[in-house]
From Swiss-Prot:
Keywords: Glycoprotein, Secreted, Signal, Virulence
Span(s) of short sequence motif Conserved undecapeptide motif: 104-114
Subcellular location: Secreted
Glycoprotein in keyword set: yes
Motif extent (Conserved heptapeptide motif): 123-129
Pfam families: NPP1
GO terms under cellular component: extracellular region
Expression induction: Highly expressed at multiple time points in both early and late stages almost the entire host infection process.
Name this protein carries in UniProt: NLP effector protein 5
Organism: Plasmopara viticola (Downy mildew of grapevine)
Family per record: Belongs to the Necrosis inducing protein (NPP1) family.
Length: 239
């Protein structure tokens, strides 16, 4: 049976939330979670870093009122997406695999566009990328067992993670890149990257969780939404 480990009880209720699109660089990020419970402490400890070799930097996707980013057109030449002045965000959601005593933590990043510069501009508005880390929580000292990064067509699995892709045996280094006319994707790298403020699913407001469940981003839901989260966990699991 699936057991989702929560820091605190999450309110479940029927809500009606009006969703408003906001300019991609005007979304206020959530404050980073505090290490005030075992799950948040674990998620902060194993938070990956992101090295941007090309393309947009990650931006906040949704604010506390449930307003979401309207993205950025792939054809707006000269428009910067090097990071929001309001701060950036990485979204986390966790699942406890009781059969193996492993915490599976998904980290997801939102990008206002996914554009590749070839002889012509190709791409689209709004994009998500994600990676899943697998942490052995059977002992007092949690250990990173594996990482699954969403690649070009499927998951790239690092089981066990390479030591030169890690900082302090905990923070996995990911590269955001593209090849040829492919879309952007994630892979392990030796290059140090940047950290974004982490907001966990259970710490988001009801409005934000509701609207991120309902919102379709370039034909798909956010990877932390119910429609995708459990499917991706099943597909990526390396054990």
């Amino acid at each position: 049976m699936r057991v989702l480990v929560l820091c605190a009880a999450v309110l479940t209720c029927f809500v009606t939330v009006s969703a408003q699109e906001v300019a991609y660089d005007r979304i206020e990020p959530f404050e980073e979670v505090k290490p005030d419970c075992p799950l948040n402490e674990l998620a902060l400890m194993f938070k990956p870093q992101l090295y941007i070799s090309n393309g947009c930097h990650p931006y906040p996707a949704i604010d506390s009122e449930g307003h979401f980013s309207n993205g950025l057109s792939a054809f707006r030449i000269g428009t910067s997406c090097d990071g929001s002045s309001k701060g950036s965000q990485v979204y986390g959601r966790a699942f406890y695999n009781s059969d193996r005593n492993i915490m599976e933590i998904m980290y997801a990043w939102y990008f206002p566009r996914d554009r590749m510069i070839t002889p012509v501009y190709i791409g689209h508005r709004n994009a998500w990328e994600h990676a899943i880390v697998y942490v052995d929580v059977a002992k007092d000292d949690p250990q990173l067992l594996a990482v699954a990064a969403r690649g070009m067509w499927s998951y790239r699995t690092y089981n066990p993670p390479r030591s030169d892709y890690l900082d302090d045996e905990k923070s996995f280094k990911l590269q955001y890149k593209w090849i040829g006319i492919s879309h952007h994707y994630l892979k392990g790298t030796k290059n140090p990257g940047e950290f974004q403020d982490l907001i966990m699913w259970d710490n988001m407001t009801v409005k934000a969780r509701h609207n991120i469940q309902e919102k379709t981003w370039f034909g798909s839901k956010a990877p932390i939404a119910d429609d995708k989260f459990f499917k991706y966990l099943e597909k990526a699991r390396p054990f």
